[in-house]
């Protein structure tokens, strides 16, 4: 209906223009006649709209004809540009990029397919999957088929399965490497432990506040070998002092002849001294709190300890001889000391010695007199100083008194306290606790006159200890 009305309006408008003749035109040749009616297409469309409408009609007509004829060939239409844009360079660049991307994709496809083909070629044909699905379906393997099979066929199948399992096991064993036998796969699941610097975790303790028991406990925990080394040091030093040094003196005196025995004593003496010096060095490290676990002194101590243990066999053999030599030396020393003790007895003094002693006494008396004079002189100096000090104090008090006469008068105690008209209170009222205590004491005194105090029995009569005898009379007769 709308199309028919539009056509009628257009026909009427064409008839009117034909009757009117030629219309006015502008400089560009555009028609300047009467405006179009609402029913005409030019009322709401311009030339661009007319062009697009004609193009869509042609496309629809062509498509309808192709559908009717059944022709499936696609025809390319030439498009006419309405508003041409200069997009040639950008199209070329886009086309080039697209071509490069396509080439890369093709290359990737070719590379992937080649790698896949190489991998498939390297795989053992017995391990590769088949190309047909039918091989893996519709088989007779199952409980029903087993019932129909004979015992020989079942045993043969079991043997084949066992062989196949052994082949798979060998193949897996060949694929194993050295890394598979380690614990790296376990360490991969382990939680990372945060590494803390020793300087951060080090706690400095005040050892002065720690008890002796705790100190020993800490010492045994940090270095258990320290106490053993200290005891060993004491033992070795006593052995060097009491046994080896006296024996070496006998060697130097020639009592012990030179030979293997003297060489053994010198070796043992040097070994013990070196061992003790290394222990003392170890104790110095411990006193300075230097870590000695990796120090070379530990290895040196171990070597010396091993050498001492080797000498223990010789010590057991020579222990009796060493004791005999030490006893002989002690006896000789005692014999030397006995005559010296006898010679220390007092002897009668001669006249010359007595006179010398008297002179010494007189000298001492002279010295004592000199000391007394020095003391008296010192006391006099002290008295003079005290007198001067007193004079200075008296002079200062007089000067202050003269100054105070001209100065202002000091305030009194009453002015300083500023108590005003407050009433006078007793001294006992200052402390309530003492006040109530005194009150309680006086109340107890008053109560003694009102109520008699309870007196407990001190000792109850328990009868005569030896019984009462009727014949004994202890009364006094009146005369």
Swiss-Prot record:
What PTMs does it carry? Citrullinated by PADI4.
Annotated compartments: Nucleus, Nucleolus
Q: Using the chain's own numbering, where are the disulfide bonds?
A: none
Residue spans with biased composition (Basic residues)? Answer: 1-10, 422-449
Q: Which GO terms describe its cellular component?
A: nucleolus; nucleoplasm; nucleus; small-subunit processome
What role does it play? Essential for gene silencing: has a role in the structure of silenced chromatin. Plays a role in the developing brain. Part of the small subunit (SSU) processome, first precursor of the small eukaryotic ribosomal subunit. During the assembly of the SSU processome in the nucleolus, many ribosome biogenesis factors, an RNA chaperone and ribosomal proteins associate with the nascent pre-rRNA and work in concert to generate RNA folding, modifications, rearrangements and cleavage as well as targeted degradation of pre-ribosomal RNA by the RNA exosome.
Query: Under what name is this protein listed?
Result: Something about silencing protein 10
Q: Which organism is it from?
A: Homo sapiens
């Amino acid at each position: 209906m709308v199309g028919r009305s539009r056509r009628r309006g257009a026909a009427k408008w064409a008839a009117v223009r034909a009757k009117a003749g030629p219309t006015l035109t502008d400089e560009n040749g555009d028609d300047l006649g009467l405006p179009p009616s609402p029913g005409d297409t030019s009322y709401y469309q311009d030339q661009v709209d007319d062009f697009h409408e004609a193009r869509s009609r042609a496309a629809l007509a062509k498509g309808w004809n192709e559908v009717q004829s059944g022709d499936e060939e696609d025809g390319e239409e030439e498009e006419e540009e309405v508003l041409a844009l200069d997009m040639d360079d950008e199209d070329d660049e886009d086309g080039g990029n697209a071509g490069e991307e396509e080439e890369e994709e093709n290359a990737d496809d070719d590379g992937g397919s080649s790698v896949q083909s190489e991998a498939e070629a390297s795989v053992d044909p017995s391990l590769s999957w088949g190309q047909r699905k039918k091989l893996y379906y519709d088989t007779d393997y199952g409980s029903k088929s087993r019932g129909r099979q004979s015992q020989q066929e079942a045993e043969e199948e079991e043997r084949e399965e066992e062989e196949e399992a052994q082949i798979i096991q060998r193949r897996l064993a060949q694929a194993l490497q050295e890394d598979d036998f380690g614990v790296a796969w376990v360490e991969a699941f382990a939680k990372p432990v945060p590494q803390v610097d020793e300087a951060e975790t080090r706690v400095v303790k005040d050892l002065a506040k720690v008890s002796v028991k705790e100190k020993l406990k800490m010492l045994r925990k940090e270095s258990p070998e320290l106490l053993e080394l200290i005891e060993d040091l004491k033992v070795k030093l006593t052995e060097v002092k009491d046994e080896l040094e006296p024996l070496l003196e006998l060697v130097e005196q020639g009592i012990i002849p030179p030979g293997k025995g003297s060489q053994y004593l010198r070796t043992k003496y040097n070994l013990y001294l070196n061992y003790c010096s290394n222990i003392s060095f170890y104790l110095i490290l411990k006193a300075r709190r230097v870590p000695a676990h990796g120090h070379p002194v530990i290895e040196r101590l171990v070597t010396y300890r091993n050498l001492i243990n080797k000498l223990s066999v010789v010590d057991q053999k020579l222990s009796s001889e060493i004791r005999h030599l030490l006893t002989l030396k002690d006896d000789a020393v005692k014999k030397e000391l006995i005559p010296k003790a006898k010679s220390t007895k007092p002897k009668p003094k001669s006249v010359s010695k007595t006179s010398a002693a008297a002179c010494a006494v007189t000298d001492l008396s002279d010295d004592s007199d000199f000391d007394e004079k020095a003391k008296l002189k010192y006391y006099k100096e002290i008295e003079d100083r005290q007198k001067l000090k007193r004079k200075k104090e008296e002079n200062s008090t007089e000067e202050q008194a003269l100054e105070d006469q001209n100065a202002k008068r000091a305030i009194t105690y009453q002015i300083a306290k500023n108590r005003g008209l407050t009433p006078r209170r007793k001294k006992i009222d200052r402390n309530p606790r003492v006040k109530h205590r005194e009150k309680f004491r006086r109340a107890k005194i008053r109560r003694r006159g009102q109520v008699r105090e309870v007196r407990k029995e001190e000792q109850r009569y328990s009868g005569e200890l030896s019984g009462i005898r009727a014949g004994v009379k202890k009364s006094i007769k009146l005369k």
